[in-house]
Regions:
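Alpha-helical multi-pass membrane segments and their bilayer interfacial helix-loop junctions
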Residues: 1-259
Length: 259
C-alpha cells in the first residue's frame, strides 16, 4: 500500500515512469512466492495495476490506453509463464497473476477502442510508447514459451489474444478514411481467443475476462463509430446477436461438474 501511494502521488510531480516501484514490487512478489500465500499473491497482483494506471496518466491522448494494454499483457503473460512451471508455489502464484492480468487486458482493450476512436481523425499519435510496447511483447513471449512448455492449447489461445491486442496498435496507425474495421476485428478476435483459452483450460476468471473485454470492445466500437443512431443501433444489435450465438456454442465446451 505504501509503495502504491508513493508511486501514484508522483503523478503530480514528474512525468517519467516510476521505475523504482518495479523493484519494490518484485521484492513483494518474491516474498509472496516464498510465503506461498494466496492472499499475498492477490495483493501483489492488484498492486501492479495502480502503477500502470498512474503511468498511463502521463501519456498524451490515446497512448494512455495503449500503456494499459501493455501492462495487462505483461502481467497476464508473466502469470501464465509461472503457471506453466512444475512447482506448486510458482504455479499457484502465476495463476493469480494471470487471472488479474486477464481481467485487466479485457478492460484495457475496451478502453483502447473507445479512446483511439476519438483521436482517429486527429494528428495525435496512436501507438504504444516503445518502453511500454517492450513490456507487452515480453508478456507475449512469456505466454508463447508457456504454451510450448506446457503443451496446453489454452495457453496458445492466450498468446493469440495478447498478440491480436498488440497488433491492433499497428492497425490504428493506418488511419483509414472510414472506420478502422481491421482494428475493431483484431480486438474482438482477441477477446474471443481469451474466452476460448479459459474454456480449454477450465479457468473461469479467464472466461469472465474475455466476456468483459468483448462487451467493452463492442461498447467502444458503438461509441467510436461515426454515423447515425440507426447505424449504431444496427451494429449493436448485430454484435449482441453474435455474442449470444457465440456464448451458446462455447457454453457446450464448459466443464460440467458432477451432479
Amino acid at each position: 500500500v505504501a509503495a502504491c501511494t508513493w508511486s501514484c502521488t508522483r503523478v503530480f510531480e514528474v512525468r517519467d515512469p516510476h521505475y523504482a516501484f518495479a523493484l519494490v514490487w518484485l521484492l513483494a512478489a518474491g516474498l509472496a512466492l516464498a510465503w506461498n500465500s494466496r492472499v499475498a499473491a492477490h495483493l501483489v497482483a492488484i498492486a501492479a495495476i495502480p502503477w500502470w494506471i498512474a503511468t498511463a496518466l502521463h501519456q498524451p491522448g490515446a497512448e494512455s490506453s495503449f500503456v494499459l494494454v501493455d501492462g495487462a499483457a505483461l502481467l497476464f503473460g508473466a502469470g501464465l509463464g509461472l503457471a506453466a512451471l512444475s512447482g506448486e508455489r510458482a504455479s499457484s502464484f502465476g495463476a493469480v497473476l494471470a487471472a488479474h492480468g486477464a481481467i485487466s487486458l479485457g478492460v484495457a482493450a475496451g478502453l483502447e477502442v473507445a479512446m483511439a476512436g476519438d483521436f482517429l481523425h486527429s494528428s495525435v499519435s496512436l501507438g504504444h510508447p516503445p518502453w511500454a510496447l517492450a513490456g507487452g511483447v515480453a508478456g507475449l513471449v512469456f505466454t508463447v514459451v508457456a504454451a510450448f512448455v506446457s503443451r496446453r492449447p489454452g495457453f496458445g489461445y492466450a498468446a493469440g489474444s495478447i498478440g491480436l491486442v498488440l497488433l491492433g496498435a499497428a492497425a490504428w496507425q493506418v488511419r483509414p478514411g472510414g472506420e478502422p474495421w481491421l482494428a475493431y476485428a483484431l480486438q474482438l478476435g482477441a477477446m474471443v481467443c481469451l474466452v476460448v483459452s479459459g474454456i480449454l483450460d477450465a479457468v473461469r476468471p479467464r472466461i469472465v475476462a474475455g466476456w468483459i473485454g468483448f462487451a467493452g470492445v463492442v461498447a467502444g466500437i458503438t461509441w467510436a463509430v461515426k454515423g447515425s443512431l440507426l447505424g449504431r443501433s444496427a451494429f449493436l444489435a448485430l454484435a449482441g446477436g453474435a455474442a449470444i450465438a457465440l456464448s451458446t456454442v462455447l457454453n457446450r465446451r464448459l466443464p460440467r461438474g458432477r451432479p
